[in-house]
């Protein structure tokens, strides 16, 4: 198991996935995002939702902005919808996937 360059817990299971940053040859760089898993129905991928709130001064109200990301799910990490996970940016793995799951956050 190799050091991937960020401070995350290593998964206990091993996998043979070449797109795994821990057991394969995938390098990560750029953004690190924490969000909630929305869907795991894609084969080997997840949909992640990140919410952010900002104040609109004129109306004294908050606006909620929701961003969705698609991320590759290595075989050594188990997640379900509703779990909070940390994803890291990597090279483009598919048409809409350029992130990989690196840790399940409690």
Swiss-Prot record:
It comes from the Archaea. Transmembrane segments: none annotated. GO terms for cellular component: cytosolic small ribosomal subunit. Keywords: Ribonucleoprotein, Ribosomal protein, RNA-binding, rRNA-binding. InterPro entries: NA-bd_OB-fold, Ribosomal_uS17, Ribosomal_uS17_arc/euk, Ribosomal_uS17_archaeal. Pfam families: Ribosomal_S17. GO terms for biological process: translation. PANTHER family: 40S RIBOSOMAL PROTEIN S11 FAMILY MEMBER, 40S RIBOSOMAL PROTEIN S11-RELATED. Belongs to the universal ribosomal protein uS17 family. One of the primary rRNA binding proteins, it binds specifically to the 5'-end of 16S ribosomal RNA. This is Small ribosomal subunit protein uS17. The lineage of its organism: Archaea, Methanobacteriati, Thermoplasmatota, Thermoplasmata, Thermoplasmatales.
